[in-house]
């Protein structure tokens, strides 16, 4: 849904009728995610929708950078900490007492912890594209994956696959960087960051995770046709 919105808002530059499709997609996404109770995805959809309405370039840039930093910090200090987060008094206070949320993020910390225990056993190559039964047998009886994209990458292809994905990200960012002042470019980059944040708590197919990077890489061609 987030990449559909990102693509829609990019196409508005070609034809204003795409704005109608964007609004319809945004409403459908918000309503459906609210009904199923997917709060992380719902929050990112709403945040991206509001972000596209901001007219100030500097503010959009600051929000983009801040959101990316939050993504990095959460991945390293929360996800990579696994169940260790439950022993952190500050984290317990912020999440349980202030936010009134479950410190396990609906048992996701159990899945992260299980993944972090098995990844070191095959850190270079990973375990390939395994099925649900493999997760249940090697990680947890409730696991159908680590519910985190980076951990899934490490499980599937180890450090090699993570480096490969990072290189693709680097090429995509480097390609769109000269156009960073464009509103459309900022919207596209922010939609990608929102997808990454959603992937902190979920697992998405590689095609979904690679799609916005492909658009970013080819942004210069898109810009030329506009």
Regions inferred by a protein language model and the residue ranges of each:
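Lipid-exposed faces of alpha-helical membrane segments in multi-pass integral membrane proteins
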Residues: 24-31, 43-51, 69-73, 160-170, ...
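Membrane-interface micro-motifs in multi-pass membrane enzymes
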Residues: 1-2, 38, 146, 154-158, ...
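Alpha-helical transmembrane segments of multi-pass inner-membrane proteins
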Residues: 1-55
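Transmembrane alpha-helices of multi-pass inner-membrane enzymes
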Residues: 187-226
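A membrane-periplasm/extracellular boundary helix in multi-pass inner-membrane enzymes
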Residues: 27, 33-36, 53-98, 116-121
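Long extracytoplasmic/lumenal interhelical loops at the membrane interface
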Residues: 96-157, 178
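Short, aromatic-rich membrane-interface segments at the entry and exit
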Residues: 18-21, 40-44, 60-66, 204-211
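Hydrophobic transmembrane alpha-helices and their immediate junctions
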Residues: 16-21, 54, 60-63, 156-196
């Amino acid at each position: 849904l987030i990449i559909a919105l990102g693509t829609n808002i990019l196409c508005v530059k070609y034809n204003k009728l795409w704005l109608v499709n964007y609004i319809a997609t945004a409403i459908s996404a918000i309503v459906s995610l609210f009904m199923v109770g997917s709060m992380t995805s719902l929050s990112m959809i709403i945040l991206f929708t509001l972000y596209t309405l901001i007219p100030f370039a500097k503010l959009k840039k600051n929000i983009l950078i801040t959101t990316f930093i939050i993504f990095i910090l959460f991945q390293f200090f929360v996800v990579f900490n696994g169940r260790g987060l439950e022993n952190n008094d500050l984290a317990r206070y912020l999440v349980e007492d202030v936010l009134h949320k479950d410190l396990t993020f609906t048992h996701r910390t159990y899945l992260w912890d299980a993944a972090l225990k098995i990844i070191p056993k095959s850190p270079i190559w990973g375990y390939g594209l395994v099925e649900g039964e493999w997760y249940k047998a090697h990680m947890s009886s409730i696991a159908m994956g680590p519910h985190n994209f980076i951990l899934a990458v490490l499980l599937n292809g180890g450090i090699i696959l993570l480096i490969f994905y990072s290189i693709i990200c680097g090429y995509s960012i480097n390609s769109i960087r000269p156009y960073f002042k464009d509103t459309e470019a900022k919207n596209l980059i922010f939609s990608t960051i929102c997808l990454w944040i959603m992937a902190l708590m979920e697992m998405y197919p590689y095609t979904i995770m690679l799609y916005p990077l492909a658009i970013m890489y080819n942004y210069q061609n898109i810009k030329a046709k506009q």
